[in-house]
Amino acid sequence: MRCPYCQSEDTQVKDSRPAEDGAAIRRRRVCPDCGGRFTTFERVQLRDLVVVKKSGRKVPFDRDKLLRSVEIAVRKRNVDPERIDRAVTGIVRQLESSGETEVASGEVGRLVMEALKSLDDVAYVRFASVYRNFREAKDFHELLGELKGDEDKSEEDAG
């Protein structure tokens, strides 16, 4: 693996351990040339996914972009980074196990909203405001009404 600091091709693995509930391997690496230390993750990729944008344009699926989107939604919220990573891994698994090589961007957004709903309500609302293209305060009000309705329903089911 190439060193991200000096571009040397000769790096050494110092530590390997399972990550993401066994879905990945986390490796700590060191570069003997510059002494730089960095972490890599090795994951199984079942198939190359392609995201079909609203415009019809097709782009390769990017797990890191998905992770960044979720991290932006949960920014400054008290959400354990491991829970975020598990949610992203779950979304990727759902997409890969669908059997399709192309997925609509709207489907990715729907899965993110589903995951955020169980992670953090504020992050859910933040993401929804962009995903659903909110224009007015009433859009937020309607979404909060949906959330409230879901909570009431959950309490009824539990009680």
Curated annotation (Swiss-Prot):
Key words of the record: ATP-binding, DNA-binding, Metal-binding, Nucleotide-binding, Repressor, Transcription, Transcription regulation, Zinc, Zinc-finger
InterPro entries, sorted: ATP-cone_dom, NrdR-like_N, RNR_NrdR-like
Entry function: Negatively regulates transcription of bacterial ribonucleotide reductase nrd genes and operons by binding to NrdR-boxes.
Disulfide bonds, paired cysteine numbers: none
Originating species: Mesorhizobium japonicum (strain LMG 29417 / CECT 9101 / MAFF 303099)
Protein's name according to its UniProt entry: Transcriptional repressor NrdR
Any Pfam family the entry gives: Zn_ribbon_NrdR
GO molecular-function terms, A-Z: ATP binding; DNA binding; zinc ion binding
Domain ATP-cone, first and last residues per copy: 49-139
Zn finger spans (unnamed): 3-34
Entry cofactors: Zn(2+)
One GO biological process term: negative regulation of DNA-templated transcription
Cofactor descriptive note: Binds 1 zinc ion.
Family: Belongs to the NrdR family.
PANTHER family, sorted: TRANSCRIPTIONAL REPRESSOR NRDR (PTHR30455:SF2)
